[in-house]
Amino acid sequence: ATTINKVCGSGMKAVMFGHDMIKAGSARLVVAGGMESMTNAPHLLMNSRTGIRFGSAEMLDHMAWDGLTNPYDKQSMGVFGELCVAKYGFSREQQDAFAAESVQRALNAQQSGAFSAEIAPVTVSTRKGDVSFDQDEQPGKCDIGKIPTLRPAFKKDGTITAASSSSINDGAAALVLCSET
């Protein structure tokens, strides 16, 4: 087992490693995937174990600090998205259209059952009873009509919004990869 800490990219990177192992002949069958629970990311009180001396101590958001902030200049990773937008000339309208189409495709896939055979429902017992999860809740939360009205998320005069960037949520997926031989 290997742990990969790449925030949203961890699962995809695990699948890439699995592919590489099969291609190299190190494995014939690999289970690869990832999970994250961003809603459970803690806040950190740095230096609390060794003793905070006189004065105040800063509390850090672990989710932002450990994965969504550039360690060198302390800028949000969203700012780098804005730099790519500027470099490649993506307009706000293009980003909004892509976000809307992405959500619509996800909704269409859910409604048609396109991936139903590939999804294993997960049931969680709560005080209020069992809750079954068998589809991504995120696409249904989006009001496609509001996408063009959203404010920029990372720069005051930016073009990337909550609709055209990754959401903060929890999720998990696993795939079985195998060699044809």
Where are the regions that the model predicts?
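Short secondary-structure boundary/hinge segments and terminal tails
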Residues: 9, 39-40, 48, 103, ...
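Active-site-proximal alpha-helical scaffold in enzymes
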Residues: 4-36, 85-114, 174-181
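Flexible glycine/proline-enriched surface loops and loop-helix/loop-strand junctions
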Residues: 65-66, 82, 86, 157-162
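Conserved catalytic cysteine-centered active-site region
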Residues: 1-29, 71-77, 141-167
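Short, well-ordered secondary-structure micro-motifs
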Residues: 14, 41-43, 131-135
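Flexible glycine-/small-residue-enriched beta->alpha junction loops
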Residues: 19, 29-83
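N-terminal extracellular/periplasmic Venus flytrap/periplasmic-binding protein-like
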Residues: 94-181
